[in-house]
Amino acid sequence: MYIKHFTMHKSSINIDILLDPDKVPESIHWNASDSSAEMAQKAKAMCLAFWDPADKTAMRIDLWTKDMMVDEMGEFFYQMIFTMSDTFARATKNAALAAEMKSFSEGFIKKFRAAQITENGV
């Protein structure tokens, strides 16, 4: 009888946030132990969520730097919703709801971009 042994692999993600005196993020840098990138990556915003199974709630850390522009924030949320639909599909095998999420994200970004044009007079 052959018994297959698995070795565990530890992976880590490090996030460094530089805050101003008012505790507003000036810069966000991150790196991951399994990443091919040699240097820490710069980011202007981050949304990190953990599932608390006891309370059945999401614990979140949402941060963005002072130089994150409103148009970038809209694009960031569009990308998050769009890519979360892929994650949802893989995790639940519910392609129909994942497609609804994608459809919502596409409508969201169209409305956001239209609002930006109206607000900025472009």
Predicted regions and their residues:
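Short, charged/polar N-terminal "headpieces" of proteins
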Residues: 2-41
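Short linear sequence elements within intrinsically disordered, low-complexity coil regions
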Residues: 7, 55-56, 113, 117
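Generic ordered-secondary-structure signal
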Residues: 23-25, 63, 76, 104, ...
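Active-site- and interface-proximal helix/loop "cap" or "latch" segments in soluble metabolic
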Residues: 26-93
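C-terminal charged interaction modules
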Residues: 86-122
